[in-house]
Amino acid sequence: MSAVDKRAKFESALPVFVDEIVNYLKTINIPDDVTEWYKNSLFHNTLGGKYNRGLSVIDSYEILLGHPLDEAAYMKAAVLGWMVELLQSFFLIADDIMDASKTRRGQPCWYLMPGVGNIAINDAFMVESAIYFLLKKHFRQESCYVDLIELFHDVTFQTELGQQLDLLTAPEDSVDLSKFSLQKHSFIVIYKTAFYSFYLPVALAMHLAGVATPENLKCAQDILIILGKYFQVQDDYLDCYGDPTVTGKIGTDILDNKCSWIINLALAKCTPEQRVILDDNYGRKDSESEKRVKAVFEELNIRGEFENYEESEVSEIKKLIDGVDESTGLKKSIFTTFLGKIYKRNK
């Protein structure tokens, strides 16, 4: 099945799960206008993305089972995949409010839609609650039910911790590079992105396939957290050095005072004179300041540093993958598939 067909099939499953929520609301006599609002919120905030996280649940489950999924198995994996997408949507609704963002996936952010405003705060909670409704409906009788609940709660908490540190370290309206460090960047990336984007989908598939032993989960986490960190460092690099005609966006990390890998590496390597330039220009909303920051990055050979980082990190990831014991039910191809998708990517 092509990537386009996989995406379309996954997308076609969402109305089934939304209908389950809507039908439940009818049984408890929730007014139609509330039900319709909730339904619109669920569709608006979950559709239109790449679905990488949700599809990773299905792909990983199929690899673990070792054969194509029948319809029942597919829907079991798909509902977990959509729970990951709901979690992502919950985070993004709140992120967009906190960041005062204007658009998301090519349309206005939910809080900017007509009549929404601050109601979006409650809508974010409602989107999160849909996860646990679907989890109970589809997995209440499964032996892994409590493990799945705990996994979602743990990863949500981890992501929120990462977001908290990011917000306190790099507020857009208050630049203080003394708060930045590579150690903080690593924590933010691992907690804010890697756990829910890389570890969660695979861990869900492992529970579904019955191979989620403590040893297997630790092995998967060790690999996937490094993969997730590498992915975010790539993102930071592409924001500064990517081709906008390929990435589809013009980078704004320097203007927005982002605690990115690039600025943290620059701070670790720079001379006192270069540090003054970075302090005076980073996070300033003008193109001349941005140019001065980029000039320092060039002097520090950030491009070359990234290439060295990439090769070192990928070598470490491959070593960890080679060490996976497949006799326990875990499969190396889960991780090689992830790595293949992101190695040397340009967007």
Curated annotation (Swiss-Prot):
Function per UniProt: Farnesyl pyrophosphate synthase; part of the second module of ergosterol biosynthesis pathway that includes the middle steps of the pathway. Fps1 catalyzes the sequential condensation of isopentenyl pyrophosphate with dimethylallyl pyrophosphate, and then with the resultant geranylpyrophosphate to the ultimate product farnesyl pyrophosphate. The second module is carried out in the vacuole and involves the formation of farnesyl diphosphate, which is also an important intermediate in the biosynthesis of ubiquinone, dolichol, heme and prenylated proteins.
Protein residues bound to dimethylallyl diphosphate: 104, 192-193, 232, 249, 258
Classification via InterPro entries: FPS1-like, Isoprenoid_synthase_dom_sf, Polyprenyl_synt, Polyprenyl_synt_CS
Binding-site list for Mg(2+) 1: 95, 99
Residues the entry annotates as binding isopentenyl diphosphate: 50, 53, 88, 105
Family the entry assigns: Belongs to the FPP/GGPP synthase family.
Annotated consequence of substituting residue 104 to Q: No effect on GGPP synthase activity
Source taxon at top rank: Eukaryota
Cofactor note: Binds 2 Mg(2+) ions per subunit.
Molecular function terms from GO: (2E,6E)-farnesyl diphosphate synthase activity; dimethylallyltranstransferase activity; metal ion binding
GO annotation, biological process: farnesyl diphosphate biosynthetic process; farnesyl diphosphate biosynthetic process, mevalonate pathway; geranyl diphosphate biosynthetic process; geranylgeranyl diphosphate biosynthetic process
Pathway: Isoprenoid biosynthesis; farnesyl diphosphate biosynthesis; farnesyl diphosphate from geranyl diphosphate and isopentenyl diphosphate: step 1/1; Isoprenoid biosynthesis; geranyl diphosphate biosynthesis; geranyl diphosphate from dimethylallyl diphosphate and isopentenyl diphosphate: step 1/1
Designated gene of the protein: fps1
GO cellular component entries: cytoplasm; cytosol; endoplasmic reticulum; nucleus
UniProt keyword annotations, A-Z: Cytoplasm, Isoprene biosynthesis, Lipid biosynthesis, Lipid metabolism, Magnesium, Metal-binding, Nucleus, Transferase
Entry EC number(s): 2.5.1.10, 2.5.1.1
Subunit structure: Interacts with spo9.
Necessary cofactors: Mg(2+)
Catalytic activity from the UniProt record: isopentenyl diphosphate + dimethylallyl diphosphate = (2E)-geranyl diphosphate + diphosphate; isopentenyl diphosphate + (2E)-geranyl diphosphate = (2E,6E)-farnesyl diphosphate + diphosphate
Entry protein name: Farnesyl pyrophosphate synthase
